[in-house]
Structures are given as structure tokens and as C-alpha cells.
From Swiss-Prot:
GO biological process, one term: monoatomic ion transport
Subunit structure: The complex is composed of two ATP-binding proteins (NrtC and NrtD), two transmembrane proteins (NrtB) and a solute-binding protein (NrtA).
Protein's UniProt name: Nitrate/nitrite binding protein NrtA
Cellular component aspect of the GO annotation: plasma membrane
Pfam family name, one: NMT1_2
Lineage of origin: Bacteria, Bacillati, Cyanobacteriota, Cyanophyceae, Synechococcales
Organism of provenance: Synechocystis sp. (strain ATCC 27184 / PCC 6803 / Kazusa)
List of residues binding nitrate: W102, Q155, H196, G240, K269
Keywords, in A-Z order: Cell inner membrane, Cell membrane, Ion transport, Lipoprotein, Membrane, Nitrate assimilation, Palmitate, Signal, Transport
SUPFAM superfamilies (UniProt xref): Chitinase insertion domain (SSF54556), Periplasmic binding protein-like II (SSF53850)
Amino acid sequence: MSNFSRSTRRKFMFTAGAAAIGGVVLHGCTSPTTTSTGTGTGSSTDQAISPLVEGENAPEVTTAKLGFIALTDAAPLIIAKEKGFYAKYGMPDVEVLKQASWGTTRDNLVLGSASGGIDGAHILTPMPYLITMGTVTDGKPTPMYILARLNVNGQGIQLGNNYKDLKVGTDAAPLKEAFAKVTDPKVAMTFPGGTHDMWIRYWLAAGGMEPGKDFSTIVVPPAQMVANVKVNAMESFCVGEPWPLQTVNQGVGYQALTTGQLWKDHPEKAFGMRADWVDQNPKAAKALLMAVMEAQQWCDQAENKEEMCQILSKREWFKVPFEDIIDRSKGIYNFGNGQETFEDQEIMQKYWVDNASYPYKSHDQWFLTENIRWGYLPASTDTKAIVDKVNREDLWREAAQALEVPADQIPSSPSRGIETFFDGITFDPENPQAYLDSLKIKSIKA
């Protein structure tokens, strides 16, 4: 008999097209050992130590330092701490540490915990690649692995209230003429080459706007976006929740769209670790991964949403009002543009359902191809080779099998196939050059 009871296994199963978010937290065997954790940032509940990490499967170490940014998609790392999942899998001393910006996250990953930095992080999916290649580390590579995707969807593109009369949505075309009337119009994102940079560039380019010609980009840390829009530092910005909803709730801007409307179930954040840490501590890496995966399942249960948002709102985590987090976590959208509030669980942030946790290699290949599109990476970049080096979907599969995730919930291929964007453009991971050729606006460098 497996580690699941039969009833638990039935509850754990997801139906492929379910609109409601379901799932169940995994359970251990009988006669468990109980541990209480209290180290690191945040609090933890008592948890039974899983038999999956006993004896020869015990982690090599009991601690790791993991970074996070105050964004709702960091929830799995935080919930794994608060609910004692790290302890459950033999890692009671894990620290989950707030980072001021993605640049800080990068710098601390390069340092590593032995030098006062961190071992892994909640991170923009392209960043482990840019760090591994040395692109954003002054040419000094720091090899990293992606162990899981943390979420899909859940980001927003906002505009200042002075653009509200344009009623801009997925079609950004009306902004071209409006931006032309502004001296040096700026749009903000959170890290060059990161997901938010890619979303806002794609959206504006689809509307006929060219970076460097029709607008320039600036970097603003997520938690500083709302303050910057209040002083009119930019015309538009892209960032993850809860900051889009906070912008609306404070009445300082409105939302044009949520990124699931650009690309349904698009990949977003990753659980990234330094490669040397994983290679030196393979059992501990698996334990961390199992803890994060269980937290993802917990986060996607509808009955846990309010508790999740209450936890995230705490001073030690986000220090943000509960009201700025909860609606978007339930798929409820008020864009602050005068239109009716609507509910859509298909485009909302997901952590586990619809294979949200599995790190498809094809998605990482798109991010690298898009970085080529905008000149962050040379056209000669061997995207497949670097994806095969960084993306450790094999470790995800190993953890999923240990947790007895049903086989039909483990993707049969590391590719999700051809992806279609809101403007009809398609990306075939087997032919990324065809995608680049199809784009009218790009800045490809040799």
C-alpha cells in the first residue's frame, strides 16, 4: 500500500478541465515522528516527518537559505515555512528571506550562503539562465538549476489614470499616439530580460510600439511600483500581484490587462537553486522540492485562499493589506477602469493545477528566444543546450513520483507544444527561428 490512503489519493486527483481549484495536501505514513520548527523567517506548525526522508533518504543538511520577493507568487516558499512542510521533509532549519529587488536576489545567489548570500530563490524564470551564462553577472557565470515552476499567470500591466479615457486593454495601439505627446515616455519593469520585461515589451510591440523609439524602459523593484506611479515616474508598468490590485485599490492607476490574457497559463516564476548546492546535496534538494510542491498544492485549494492571503499580508512577509491580495487570488478582477468586476479562474494565478508546477523546457526556450528578440542574448545562443543544462525537470519528476502524484498529472513530454499568444502569433519550440521571423518589431543582435 502507498503512503496515501485510498481516499486521500482520490481527493488528490484533479480533473483535467476543472474550473475550480482543487487538490489535497499529501500525507505521510503511520507512526510518524513529530517536529516543531521555529527558526528562520516566519513561523511553522508541527508536522509529522515524512517516511520519504528517513534513513538513507535523509537530507544531507537540514537548512538552506531561500530568497523571495514580496509577490503573491512567492506563496509556495512562504507557505512551506509557515505550514511546516520543510520540516516534514527533514529540512526544519530552512530560512525564507525577503529580498529588496531582483538585483539583490541575483547578487545574493552569486554569493551563496557560505559567503552571506542565499542558496536558492523564488525567481523570474529567465534569471537562472542569465545568471548561469554570466549575462547579468559581469560575465562571471554562476551555474543554476530550475527545479520547478512556482506559478503560471498572475501578473498585471497598469497605466496611469491620465490614460483611462483611452480604455486600453489587450490592444495597446492607442498608446502609440498618446506616448508620442509625452517627452521621453517610460515604462517600468522589474529586471532586464525578466518576465515582466518580456510581457510589457510583447504587449506594446503587438500594438506597434518599438522600445527605444516609442518608449524607454526603467527598472523599479516590485514593492516600489505603486509609490513610483504616484509621482508619475512612468506611463505604464508590469509587475506581479499584489501590486496591480494595490494600484487599483489606492486609485492611483488602472489595469489594462492581466497577463493570462496575453498568453493563457503562461509560465512565470521558478524555484531556482545554485547548481553546486543541488549537486552537493541531492537528497536535500529533493526534500526542498517535495516541500515546495506540497505547498503549491495547498495554495491551490480554494478553502485555503483566505488563510494564504492572511499569512502573506503579515509584517514579516509582505506587510500589505489582506484586501490587496485576496481578490486576485480568487480570480476576481476589478481593473479600476469603470468596467464591471468579473471573475475568471482560467486566467488567474495557479500554483499546481493545469501542470503549473512542472517546468516545461519549451517555456524556458521561449524566454531565451524572447531575450534574443530584444538583444539581451546574441542570436547565436544555443537555447536548447542551455535549457538542457539549467532546467532539471528530471528532478521534478523524481519528486513527483516519490510523492505518488498520479501519472496522468505528470506531463509526458518536456514540451507543451505550440503556444499561441493573444495576437495570433505562435511559438513552436521545435522552430524558434520561425517565431522570430514572424515578428515585425525586434532588436536582434548578432
